[in-house]
């Protein structure tokens, strides 16, 4: 497991390299032991051609059941989907903003680029998923933990706070993934901090 209610699953198969999956993309997954409905999950590790890894938080009965999926379960994967990839980058440097389990595609994206900065937002420290891996990769990560409802909490991820964390923010491409409300909040504030709309890339798992 990767944290409370969070589990990583590795899916192996033949000729997976032919799918040309890229870090930051997602698939629609069907686990045939019980799931006939597809669920979108991002790759949480850069694909190596022989396996994929996803990291899932228990947000409902289906995702909670993934922690009990037997080894050897057959899987149907449709994809890859999404443009939350390095190909969208217009400049040399990136800021990647993640909220909660939205860290999964960000974790896959940051394996090879030294100029990346990550801002990882959570209400509580135990909601920070894959923190050990991010630290082991040597990524420049700012963990922003706290509730907007407490005194001083309204400053978290404000334009001023973002510029304080990343002084060259306006010169970076910004990638955002997380809950819908957090995405909208972050996009509004990075725009206010001087980032052009064309340099903002969002993953909403839309098909």
Residue map of PLM features:
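FNR/FR-type flavoprotein reductase catalytic core
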Residues: 53, 58-207
